[in-house]
């Protein structure tokens, strides 16, 4: 381990000194028996007061003489002789405390002067407006509820180090209003989705997180062991097969918002643990799903942000406009127009072009790949990142869609779509394959690919086949990446910005 630089060492020494001084203050509070009281109940919150009395002038507030009780974290403090001010932040916003020895008593005032930024404080008093027009609480009672032993980051620089923001999210939330706004928007978006689904007569369900067989997606699972049953199990990579079992069982519209786990890489748009919403509706197809998904995302934006027109990384997006629909080859030729129809149907050309673009076509997934899979790989290299406006890419090849229904009109193509916005996938849906014999044959092909070295190929799920043999009605199903959707709505460039506690390497 390398030695810290002198500035780092100096900062650490300063912080250690501050912590030591604060521990001494806490020790004194313990000696007085008042270290961590738990008998204060706020009657109001900062944002509510700021909103309700935004237009009330000084005279109106004085006449009303509203008694309030407010608690929160002290973010700023100005001691000015016989009158002091503190900016206090609760879960809703900030409000100013006005403190004088005449109102709270000399002993409390002297104690207040020794309190530190970051301390959790509480006050009772009367709401008023200062001569400078600041809505404030004129404190008649002031208490320290919890001592902060560690100092907050400098108010002008905040948490400059991005990794520290992720690792110490609790500090980031304290000092960064934008972070708090991001996660409030996330909560609003998820609440909007739940209401949208409920209004459409969907039932929310919970399915297992531990699976005896990983299924429902092409991904590498996390493996664990169930001690009581003495069996290998897998953290789920997708809830799909369980949700479709519920369709078989007679629940005709179901959805689940929960975690999936995939033992794969970390990137600005990938995290091994992530939140998905999957939903399934009997007697629908992929066209119905696209219409429904478009309306759902539009409504989530309106409910979370108040508008369907958003800005992402400096560019405007109008989610109120109809989403485009393109086939894979149409998208390739739109963004790479030099490719001809003949070239896009030529196995040797596609393999050579992919190799030129840096794709390793010798990996197991490409060994027996057909034209459709090669076209999809070329789409990912040439067009995917260009799909800024919301776009449904449709007509996916059957060989990369083992759970999707084959088209009635075009052999080798499935009734499947993926929704792309700002160059990244947001949703994936299709008309479900409900033919048990066809599904079993596709599972067997997946097993062959797994035996050939493709770690992401699916297992054969005999119980799922048994469920289909009881009969599943025509069904449409879709998965929406909640984290990526929130990235879009909150102008967040990386998935870590929308996860409260993203995975990081250990601190060593």
From Swiss-Prot:
GO biological process: lysyl-tRNA aminoacylation
NCBIfam families: lysS_bact, PRK00484.1
Phylogenetic lineage: Bacteria, Pseudomonadati, Pseudomonadota, Betaproteobacteria, Burkholderiales
The protein's name: Lysine--tRNA ligase
CC cofactor: Mg(2+)
Amino acids binding Mg(2+) 2: 425
Subcellular location: Cytoplasm
Biological source species: Burkholderia pseudomallei (strain 1710b)
Entry EC no(s): 6.1.1.6
Organism superkingdom: Bacteria
Reaction equation(s) it catalyzes: tRNA(Lys) + L-lysine + ATP = L-lysyl-tRNA(Lys) + AMP + diphosphate
Gene Ontology molecular function: ATP binding; lysine-tRNA ligase activity; magnesium ion binding; tRNA binding
Keyword annotations of the record: Aminoacyl-tRNA synthetase, ATP-binding, Cytoplasm, Ligase, Magnesium, Metal-binding, Nucleotide-binding, Protein biosynthesis
Note on how the cofactor is bound: Binds 3 Mg(2+) ions per subunit.
Subunit structure: Homodimer.
Enzyme class: ligase
Residues noted as binding Mg(2+) 1 in the record, renumbered to the chain: 418, 425
Family stated for the protein in its record: Belongs to the class-II aminoacyl-tRNA synthetase family.
GO cellular component term, pick one: cytosol
Classification via InterPro entries: Aa-tRNA-synt_II (IPR004364), aa-tRNA-synth_II (IPR006195), aa-tRNA-synth_II/BPL/LPL (IPR045864), Lys-tRNA-ligase_II (IPR002313), Lys-tRNA-ligase_II_N (IPR044136), Lys-tRNA-synth_II_C (IPR018149), NA-bd_OB-fold (IPR012340), NA-bd_OB_tRNA (IPR004365)
């Amino acid at each position: 381990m390398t030695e810290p630089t002198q500035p780092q060492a100096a900062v650490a020494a300063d912080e250690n000194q501050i912590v030591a001084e604060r521990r001494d203050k806490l020790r004194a509070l313990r000696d007085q028996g008042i270290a961590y009281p738990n008998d204060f109940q706020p009657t109001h919150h900062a944002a509510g007061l700021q909103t309700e009395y935004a237009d009330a002038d000084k005279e109106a507030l004085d006449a009303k003489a509203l008694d309030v009780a407010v608690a929160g974290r002290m973010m700023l403090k100005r001691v000015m002789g016989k009158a002091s001010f503190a900016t206090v932040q609760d879960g809703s916003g900030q409000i100013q405390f006005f403190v004088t020895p005449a109102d709270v008593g000399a002993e409390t005032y002297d104690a207040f002067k020794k309190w530190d930024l970051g301390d959790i404080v509480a006050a009772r008093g009367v709401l008023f407006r200062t001569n400078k027009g600041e809505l404030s609480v004129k404190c008649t009672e002031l208490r320290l509820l919890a001592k902060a032993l560690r100092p907050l980051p400098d108010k002008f620089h905040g948490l400059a180090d991005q990794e520290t923001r992720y690792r110490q999210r609790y500090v980031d939330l304290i000092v960064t209003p934008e972070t708090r706004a991001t996660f409030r928007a996330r909560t609003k978006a998820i609440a909007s989705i739940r209401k949208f689904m409920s209004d459409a007569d969907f039932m929310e369900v919970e399915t297992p997180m531990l699976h005896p067989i990983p299924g429902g997606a092409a991904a590498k699972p996390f493996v664990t062991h169930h001690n009581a049953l003495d069996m290998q199990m897998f953290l789920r990579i997708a809830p799909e097969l369980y949700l479709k079992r519920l369709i078989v069982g007679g629940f005709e519209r179901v959805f689940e918002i929960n975690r999936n786990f995939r033992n794969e890489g970390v990137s600005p748009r990938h995290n091994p643990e992530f939140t998905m919403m999957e939903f399934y509706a009997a007697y629908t197809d992929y066209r119905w799903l696209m219409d429904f998904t478009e309306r759902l995302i539009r409504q989530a934006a309106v409910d979370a942000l108040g508008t369907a027109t958003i800005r992402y990384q400096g560019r405007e997006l109008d989610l109120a406009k109809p989403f485009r629909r393109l086939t894979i080859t149409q998208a390739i030729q739109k963004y790479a127009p030099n490719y001809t129809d003949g070239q896009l149907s030529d196995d040797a050309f596609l393999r050579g072009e992919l190799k030129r673009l840096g794709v390793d076509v010798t990996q197991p997934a490409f060994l027996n790949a057909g034209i459709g899979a090669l076209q999809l790989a070329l789409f990912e290299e040439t067009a995917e990142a260009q799909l800024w406006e919301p776009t449904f890419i449709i007509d996916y090849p059957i060989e990369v869609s083992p759970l999707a229904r084959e088209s009635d009109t075009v052999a080798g193509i499935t009734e499947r779509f993926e929704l792309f916005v700002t160059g990244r996938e947001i949703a994936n849906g299709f008309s479900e394959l409900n033919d048990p014999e066809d599904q079993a044959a596709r599972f067997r092909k997946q097993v062959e690919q797994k035996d050939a070295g493709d770690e992401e190929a699916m297992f054969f799920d005999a119980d799922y086949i048994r469920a289909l043999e009881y009969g599943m009605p025509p069904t449409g199903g879709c998965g929406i990446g909640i984290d990526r959707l929130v990235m879009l709505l909150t102008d967040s460039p990386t998935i870590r910005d929308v996860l409260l506690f993203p995975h990081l390497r250990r601190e060593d």
